[in-house]
């Protein structure tokens, strides 16, 4: 059977949607990418989406750009995609997605792309499809631009703690601040204060295919262990399901047992496993 790898075009999108529908939680980042293109005032184009076609039928896909994301890739598709990535060289900051696919793809490009700064091989993906049965913290609200003075340092602190490097390095400060401001404007940022002190925040980084992917969950260090996270996350889920999407999801490092226990207490269930390869 004849196969080829090529950038997607408008004629391929129906087939992409079929892939997304197989697992919307797994593929919400791809769904968000397509929805973003639909909102553009320009003719949609997809140079960052490479498809693996077999006799004209889309079987697998690779998102390229700031992050490499394999989508429904078979062993042979990963071999073909790896060859493309080796020729182009590394331009991305991470590879992220289903663990088996990410780790196999990384094994095929590591000699030419390596070394990785860190490989996180086991990241449980958790999801909720109904509101939490836990008590909800009514003080959690959407953030607004008056919160940015407190919010941006908290976001930088959380990112640095989670990823191991500040998002402001190499001149990235303005772009990162603009990104947080965009999330605030889009009602995808949530905060809780005690008095005038910001003690909790979370964002929705991606919305697609009816799934909102939560990121950046943070409790101020001196307030951890005080029972803030569970009712606060229950409130975030309620706001998401009321305004953004019927499904809330997130993924977390397997060694962060405290966070996993908190999320499961809220009502999140383990539905998948991701892996992330981080580059400097």
Tell where the protein language model's regions lie, with residue ranges.
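Acyl-donor-binding surface of acyltransferase catalytic domains
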Residues: 54-58, 65-138, 277
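Short amphipathic alpha-helix that is part of the acyltransferase structural core
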Residues: 1-30, 131-169
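Conserved donor-binding loop and adjoining core beta-sheet/short helix segment
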Residues: 3-11, 18, 24, 31-90, ...
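Acetyl-CoA-dependent GNAT
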Residues: 54-56, 63-68, 131, 163-164, ...
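Conserved acetyl-CoA-binding loop-helix of GNAT-fold acetyltransferases
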Residues: 75-84, 215-221, 225-242, 260-265
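Conserved active-site alpha-helix within GNAT-family acetyltransferase domains
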Residues: 101-118, 230, 254-272
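Conserved GNAT acetyl-CoA-binding A-motif
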Residues: 89-99, 240-252
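Conserved beta-strand-loop-alpha-helix junction that forms the acyl-donor binding cleft
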Residues: 96-102, 221, 250-260, 277-280
């Amino acid at each position: 059977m004849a196969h080829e790898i090529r950038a997607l075009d408008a004629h391929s999108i129906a087939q992409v949607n079929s892939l997304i529908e197989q697992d919307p939680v797994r593929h919400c980042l791809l769904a968000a990418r397509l929805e973003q293109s639909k909102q553009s005032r320009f003719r949609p184009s997809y140079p960052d989406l490479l498809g693996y076609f077999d006799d004209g039928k889309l079987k697998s896909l690779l998102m390229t750009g700031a992050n490499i994301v394999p989508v429904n890739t078979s062993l042979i598709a990963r071999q073909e995609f790896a060859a493309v990535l080796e020729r182009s060289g590394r331009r991305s900051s991470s590879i992220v997605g289903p663990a088996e696919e990410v780790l196999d793809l990384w094994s095929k490009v590591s000699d030419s792309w390596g070394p990785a700064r860190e490989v996180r091989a086991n990241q449980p993906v958790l999801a909720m499809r109904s509101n939490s049965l836990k008590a909800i913290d009514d003080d959690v609200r959407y953030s607004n631009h008056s919160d940015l003075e407190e919010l941006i340092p908290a976001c930088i602190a959380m990112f640095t703690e989670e990823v191991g490097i500040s998002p402001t390095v190499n001149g990235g400060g303005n772009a990162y601040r603009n990104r947080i401001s965009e999330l605030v404007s889009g009602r995808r940022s949530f905060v809780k204060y005690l008095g005038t002190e910001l003690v909790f925040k979370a964002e929705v980084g991606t919305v697609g295919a009816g799934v909102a992917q939560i990121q950046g969950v943070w409790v101020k260090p001196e307030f951890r262990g005080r029972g803030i996270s569970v009712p606060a996350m229950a409130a975030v889920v309620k706001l998401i399901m009321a305004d953004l999407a019927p499904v809330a999801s997130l993924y977390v490092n397997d060694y962060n047992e405290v966070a996993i226990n908190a999320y499961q207490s809220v009502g999140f269930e383990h539905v998948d496993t991701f892996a992330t390869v981080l580059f400097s």
